[in-house]
Regions:
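Intrinsic disorder/low-complexity segments enriched in polar/small residues
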Residues: 13, 18, 26, 193-194
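Structured loop/turn residues at beta-strand edges in well-structured enzyme cores
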Residues: 14-17, 59, 99
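Conserved beta-alpha-beta core of the PfkB/ribokinase-like small-molecule kinase fold
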Residues: 3-4, 8-9, 19-91, 111-113
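Conserved phosphate-binding/catalytic region of the ribokinase-like
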Residues: 51-52, 76-194
């Protein structure tokens, strides 16, 4: 990830422009993130870890995906002076939207996530499972969300699917080895709707 700079992204400009969704995260150099964001139809930005990135790049995200701590830091990068945003995910969500973010998802671990944007606001609860290993859960969430957005799903529906994926991921050891099948995700989602 550390080698994906602006030059590398420019070399793939056609692929980025043609992609339905482009995903970046904080382990990519800031100039590479900025170049990808500006060329993408839809830019999903997982600001993890939080890095020094141009505030306008954060505002291009649709959605910005962060945890509670990262949400507070992102709000500060965007100019917020509101204290204790890391303690109130709903307040952090609204603050990030007020600061110009297109849409925001704040992941809450075993509590699911909150999501807000032009489609509205929602709190997505996670099913209760015995957590065995949380490694890879955030990546699973972001990947599943991006895939659902690329399939044309709404942000809120994408978050419901991604929350189910992350929930199942923590129930097994390992990172990629713990990622569930679509069938497993649909089974847990049917249980939520019952």
């Amino acid at each position: 990830n550390g080698t994906i700079d602006a030059q590398t992204v420019r070399a793939q400009a056609k692929r980025i422009q043609d992609a339905d969704v482009v995903v970046c995260q904080g382990e990519i150099p800031p100039d590479g993130i900025a170049e990808a964001a500006r060329g993408a139809k839809r830019f999903v930005f997982n600001l993890a870890p939080v890095i020094d990135v141009d505030p306008e790049v954060i505002r291009l995200a649709d959605p910005l995906v962060v945890n509670e701590h990262e949400a507070a830091l992102a709000a500060t990068v965007l100019g917020s002076t509101t204290p204790h945003l890391g303690d109130d995910s709903d307040a952090a969500l609204r603050e990030l939207l007020n600061l110009g973010c297109r849409s925001v998802v704040i992941t809450l671990g075993s509590a699911g996530c909150v999501v807000g944007g032009p489609e509205g606001f929602d709190a997505v609860a996670a099913a209760t499972v015995k957590a065995v290993d949380t490694v890879g859960a955030g990546d699973a969430f972001v990947g599943a969300l991006a895939a659902e957005l690329a399939r044309g799903r709404s942000l809120i529906e994408g978050c419901r699917f991604a929350t189910a994926v992350a929930t199942l991921t923590v129930a097994k050891p390992g990172a990629q080895a713990s990622y569930p099948s679509v069938g497993e995700v649909e089974n847990i989602r049917q249980g939520e709707q019952a």
